[in-house]
Amino acid sequence: MTGYLGLGSNQGDRLATLRAARASLERHEVTVTAGSSVYETAPEGELLDQPDFLNACVQIETALAPEPLLDVCKQVERELGRVPGGPRHGPRPVDVDLLLLGELEHRSERLVLPHPDITARRFVLEPLLELDPGLTLPDGTELSGALDLVADQRVALVDTL
């Protein structure tokens, strides 16, 4: 099944960490079929006094169901130095978010698919639409239509994944 993951980092060698996350996914029943460009973005939320983030997205193929795929995402984060339980929107060596998985809609205590903030974050939309300009949510909503709503959010293209 085709899915999309968001990658982020704002501690250490951010670009190397994103590339390591991409490589690590391949060791966990996930095939990365495409990677977006890397974008630099300012922190958001209640903790703004921290370094800028680098963000990217990857397109994947996997036979994993949503919850086991989330476990893989959390395992990759731990492998790359993230300690569970840090503050929401706080600094982190790596973040691996499950954004979309096929046409699945999923809701549990641990996971909501599609990711509930997917249309509110330009640092997610830009790389996602780079991978698939016609990408839609399971309800048919075209993600390209959400870009106008987040046009005021700063993102800067910095590298490739």
What are these regions (language model features)?
Residues L7-S9, T62, L129:
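Short, structured patches in soluble enzyme cores that scaffold and shape functional sites
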Residues E29, E44-F53, L64-L161:
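Flexible, gly/pro- and Lys/Arg-enriched active-site loops
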